[in-house]
Design a protein with these regions (language model features):
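Conserved acetyl-CoA-binding loop-helix of GNAT-fold acetyltransferases
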Residues: 66, 71, 77-90, 101-102
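Conserved active-site alpha-helix within GNAT-family acetyltransferase domains
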Residues: 94-98, 103-129
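Short amphipathic alpha-helix that is part of the acyltransferase structural core
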Residues: 1-23, 29-30, 35-45, 59, ...
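A contiguous, mid-protein "functional segment" used to position or interact
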Residues: 116-148
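Conserved glycine-rich acetyl-CoA-binding loop
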Residues: 44, 58-59, 72-83, 95, ...
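Conserved beta-strand in the GNAT
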Residues: 35-39, 43-55, 62-70
């Protein structure tokens, strides 16, 4: 969605493409039913969050990777991010997912139940700040045996076939 990409660029800048989380999202579709946008009264995209299927370690349990969460910088602190987070977590639970992970600021995400407590045996595929790898169990004990590096899973994007010029 071009409007979502424009919002992500405004909110996060071009460096977002270099993050470890992006490696897990690249070439994949969000988890089924877990891509959300907030719109204003005129239909403009004001916020977005998506969740992506991942596997925790080699042959480990399935989980979701949340992100990026972005809100139009001109209307931050209006509760849009919080509303998107609550909705995303509720939908993930309703769809039967067991855990959500993210890389983010603990002081913000703790209000939704995320912490680094359950991520000590997990790693991202690339550089990241360990204290920012946070998790929320939707099913108690879902991360008890989780170990290793997060790996991309889920639906792949279909390659677009471009017509060849003669």
């Amino acid at each position: 969605v071009p409007a979502r990409e424009a919002l992500l660029y405004r909110a996060m800048g071009p460096k977002r493409r270099k993050k470890s989380s992006e490696k897990l999202r690249r070439g994949r579709r969000p988890s089924e039913g877990l891509a959300f946008v907030a719109r204003d009264a005129w239909g403009a995209v004001t916020g977005t969050v998506r969740l992506w299927d991942v596997v925790l370690g080699e042959g480990g349990p399935a989980a979701l990777l949340l992100g990026p969460l972005a809100v139009d910088p001109t209307i931050k602190n209006a509760g849009i991010g919080s509303a998107l987070m609550r909705h995303a977590i509720a939908e993930a639970a309703r769809l039967g997912h067991a855990a959500i992970l993210l890389v983010g600021d603990a002081p913000y995400y703790e209000r939704f139940g995320f912490s680094a407590e359950k991520t000590g045996s997990l790693a991202m595929p690339g550089p990241y700040e360990r204290h920012r790898l946070l998790a929320l169990e939707l099913v108690e004990g879902a991360l008890a045996e989780a170990r290793g590096t997060l790996r991309a899973a889920g639906r792949k994007l279909k390659a677009q076939r471009l017509p060849l010029a003669a």
